[in-house]
């Protein structure tokens, strides 16, 4: 190691920043976050520094730096574009044994400022020892995207119970095991969901041994349309900590690769007239697994509340007193249209959009066809590949133009995506003559014409215009 990573307590202690520009402002903000008493010395200041002065957050001295300014300081940062001045500040600080940092000059520093992931009281510092600051910032960004902001609240909760845990467990191993269970379990998830008081009560009950049988939890997670990059941070976190994953046919293989490696996987996918597990059995299985104390991820393609029967599943959970949370996902209509270069609404072509299922409860398609056939709107059909002849006929009967543009998006947002462009009249012929597989989304409306201009993701569409 070129540097020893340490954390310095500057709370209510005098810190000096030389310079009043935008870089100085960023450093001042860091010092203020650590409750340092900041003095800024510069001939002029930027608007943000001036605002701090007006709000009495810092002391500002409008003049050139003088040698005596280092007296009494516990930490100094020089953030000017004057190399001679920066060197002078560094030398004076070093002579007085005061830690000093000079921006973009590692050779003049006795300490360097890392990139910081702040989940106070949890702090993560990333440094490249001054070799590649941009790389350190990229690493920081990756960490920012994976660590919930509520980790700080979890640490504070643990701190409040630290003495009780020390009193209860004499062996270090027992303490460690207890905290590992807390930090990776349901109590932590309650903190992440903002249920601090519930988490506090559960932790206290666990310490008091009043929890007879720890009930698990169910995470109803939207897996998006296929591209794993479209998962939310929360979805990914819950997928990676679940003990059991119940997944659908529409969840892509690349999304499934991100679930916890040692989790039990249970396939409960459905196809037309072929349900691997009936919906009622799925609902009960979620209850049974949670009652065993397991963390269950119910992973669905798209969004669980848009034609995903998620509402039915959590109704059963609520009736049985099972804790659950729902994580929205990017629905297929949004993902597939975006990756096809087809905006669902457009000022010139469509002022509204309707999502319609082509697979109704009783097997019929008893839809408000006269409403669907009006102009200036986009219709998106889910699960309608086997019903294209009927839906095409009904829309034409209800006065939608036979030449209305139609797009079929097969396996949208994935590397296997295919987009077929046709018209409402020719839609049945296209499906009959081409080998098109589910999942396929059908988009109907003038906005489909924009694909030729706005397509960004895949190759040219397969067309069947006649």
Curated annotation (Swiss-Prot):
The modification Phosphoserine is found at residue 128. Its EC number is 2.1.1.107, 1.3.1.76, 4.99.1.4. S-adenosyl-L-methionine binds at residues 225, 301-303, 306, 331-332, 383, 412. GO terms for molecular function: NAD binding; precorrin-2 dehydrogenase activity; sirohydrochlorin ferrochelatase activity; uroporphyrin-III C-methyltransferase activity. NAD(+) binds at residues 22-23, 43-44. Pathway: Cofactor biosynthesis; adenosylcobalamin biosynthesis; precorrin-2 from uroporphyrinogen III: step 1/1; Cofactor biosynthesis; adenosylcobalamin biosynthesis; sirohydrochlorin from precorrin-2: step 1/1; Porphyrin-containing compound metabolism; siroheme biosynthesis; precorrin-2 from uroporphyrinogen III: step 1/1; Porphyrin-containing compound metabolism; siroheme biosynthesis; siroheme from sirohydrochlorin: step 1/1. GO terms for biological process: cobalamin biosynthetic process; methylation; siroheme biosynthetic process. Gene3D superfamilies: Cobalt-precorrin-4 Transmethylase, Domain 1 (3.40.1010.10), Methyltransferase, Cobalt-precorrin-4 Transmethylase, Domain 2 (3.30.950.10), NAD(P)-binding Rossmann-like Domain (3.40.50.720), Sirohaem synthase, dimerisation domain (1.10.8.210), Siroheme synthase, domain 2 (3.30.160.110). Transmembrane segments: none annotated. Keywords: Cobalamin biosynthesis, Lyase, Methyltransferase, Multifunctional enzyme, NAD, Oxidoreductase, Phosphoprotein, Porphyrin biosynthesis, S-adenosyl-L-methionine, Transferase. It catalyses: uroporphyrinogen III + 2 S-adenosyl-L-methionine = precorrin-2 + 2 S-adenosyl-L-homocysteine + H(+); precorrin-2 + NAD(+) = sirohydrochlorin + NADH + 2 H(+); siroheme + 2 H(+) = sirohydrochlorin + Fe(2+). Then it catalyzes the NAD-dependent ring dehydrogenation of precorrin-2 to yield sirohydrochlorin. Finally, it catalyzes the ferrochelation of sirohydrochlorin to yield siroheme. In the N-terminal section; belongs to the precorrin-2 dehydrogenase / sirohydrochlorin ferrochelatase family. In the C-terminal section; belongs to the precorrin methyltransferase family. This is Siroheme synthase. It comes from Vesicomyosocius okutanii subsp. Calyptogena okutanii (strain HA). The lineage of its organism: Bacteria, Pseudomonadati, Pseudomonadota, Gammaproteobacteria, Candidatus Pseudothioglobaceae.
